[in-house]
């Protein structure tokens, strides 16, 4: 059991002094010279919260000779000798930069010449690997669990999680001081709000980091449990169903009957557990008995309640059978229906009819949410009829076409793997005629006249994907080729990150 407790330390061997690079300002400037944010991208920060300001603040702090004092009041807290609000904002911003550097070193071995991926993290996969996984593996699984990651979490729990990785007493006193200033220390985060909305947008970097730290902690424990459960078929374990650490290795040999031993091993063998997290939720897909799946459900609940002190009820996890349940995932509507196929087999004078159950993954484009998104962005009305985009009417023809083509190409790349293309073609139709109406509005012409002009100049060919061009070039292809081109094509660009999943 001691070796498992050591494993649950989660490789917390980087005992860094977090305040050292912050106070020795030249070091933090050198560390962040070529550093890009690892946890957040494209955040509009105020120019007042730059690395240069952090350096100047550190210099000013060295020049101060008086102590830092608090004056407790029922309405406000005043900071004697300092502009506390300004200083705390600056130091929190500097702290966010420092911890991103230190924790990104756990994923990347950083140097001033470049970055090299650590061997233990070379199996990081892109979002594009999810769809082939669904097509190849999901049909062999039978249960799916929707897990809503519980929050709010107490700030003290976050600080304690951080202490496992970074041991610096002075830092934790300082960070508690900042947290106490921004909130009542004995209160939780407000419900139904994201973790960084409790604080100002200026501190989004630091609290995104703390939220990711919380998720990383619980997922690391879950990964440990999942890996050990998959190895139970190779070693003898004693099972404890009522505890989070639900098994320990038997140090002394125990005489058990072969029947009981084989039953225990069969109970955990061939688990087929797959876990995906996105947008504050996660999906756990399994192939197991309902009894073991319910046990995993209670393991999650006990983990959150006992390890993180978060109340998680039974409603945070829903378990459904994949064959009887459809679900939304990453902008798709997924279902696995059971298709019955009848095969006639004849042997000499006797013939047999054999029914074969075949599972097939259906990936359907969610037309209603997409229509709402297009109507919200003024590409169509609430009925789905294309309308012009008057905001873009002042742009050049090239810019208008480029914007519409980029949006249409993104839709084509992302939804080309849908099983039923009717909804997919409706979206392309809306975008195409919205572009034509916008150009006709700009040139004060009718849609019919401008459509002929665009067709003659072949400016709309970019609206066709490779699959559509195949159908135009080979209109009389064989039945086999038609079935091939009508099939599912995952046209995904690993160099491009699609943003549609954030709005669906």
Curated annotation (Swiss-Prot):
Indicate yes or no for the key word tRNA processing: yes
* Organism placement in taxonomy: Eukaryota, Viridiplantae, Streptophyta, Embryophyta, Tracheophyta
- Which cystines does this chain contain? none
Key words of the record: Chloroplast, mRNA processing, Plastid, RNA-binding, tRNA processing
InterPro entries attached here? Domain_X, Maturase_MatK, Maturase_MatK_N
Q: Which family does it belong to?
A: Belongs to the intron maturase 2 family. MatK subfamily.
UniProt GO MF annotations: RNA binding
Q: Where in the cell is it found?
A: Plastid, Chloroplast
Major location, coarse class?
Answer: plastid
An example GO biological process term is: tRNA processing
Q: Which organism is it from?
A: Vigna mungo (Black gram)
Question: What name does this protein carry?
Answer: Maturase K
Top-rank taxon, per record:
Eukaryota
